[in-house]
Amino acid sequence: MALPSLAIREQVREAAFSLVWSEQLNDAFKNIAPYYDRGNQVASLGCWNWFLRCFMSMIELQPKQRVLDVCAGTNAVGIALLKREPTLEIFAIDRSTDMQDVGRQRAEHLGFHINSVIADVHSLPFPDNHFDVVTLQFASRHLKIAHMFGEINRVLKPGGHFYHCDMLRPSNPVVEKLYYAYLRLCLSGTGLLFRSSPAAYNLIQYFISALEIFYTTEELSILLEEQGYCEVSAKAIFSGMLGCHSARKPLAEA
């Protein structure tokens, strides 16, 4: 499949998926919120918690830092961060009230407090230079990601760190084809197991299509640099099926 250049990839993605992003995803996540984490664990053949640990191992923290978790979902990352450093002030932003309700209950059950914000993450309701650390995981395929990287850069303090993890497009064509075949099978099976709604079932092809015109680990590194980040580093896992990135906002404008 011939892909558009990085310069116009975001335009192609938005033209193809804007309706799904603005309307259909909310309905799907409303339905799957109670078993979102279990579904991911099943679909990943038990690797989901390992994926989370790989991501967490990249994140550097200091006591009492202010952290923003973008597309926080059920607060898996926020909770893991507080287990590591209980003095953190964590804000979780997500557009799904249902996912955040589950996440808030999980955090409170463990004795943690996470500040929940329900909003469209494309326009972060925070001032410039506000957070020491920002995380974004397993949601980039559903976002205008170049714009999102710029918005995250805006709310980061100079010298602050951004950490990203998501399913990405493998750079090896053979691995890519096998990956999509596996995803079709596992997404259908997981939907049956957890009795997903028609809205969730209808999005199975979208999840594949979104990956087919998404970015490889290497391309996402370039995109981060284009959005003004420095010290960009990346880790490709399972031949690039999963990618983790870390980047820093420069201390001063060049």
Language model: regions and residue ranges:
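Conserved alpha-helix/loop element of class I SAM-dependent methyltransferases that forms part
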Residues: 45-63
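A short glycine-rich, Lys/Arg-flanked "PGG" loop and its adjoining helix->strand segment in the class I
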Residues: 146-158
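C-terminal alpha-helical "lid/dimerization" subdomain adjacent to the S-adenosyl-L-methionine
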Residues: 23, 169-223, 233
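Conserved beta-strand signature within the Rossmann-like core of class I S-adenosyl-L-methionine
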Residues: 160-167
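Class I SAM-dependent methyltransferase SAM/SAH-binding core
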Residues: 66-123
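A short acidic, Gly/Pro-enriched loop at the edge of an enzyme's catalytic core
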Residues: 122-134
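Core SAM-dependent methyltransferase catalytic element
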Residues: 228-254
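A short SAM/SAH-binding and catalytic strip from SAM-dependent methyltransferases
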Residues: 133-146
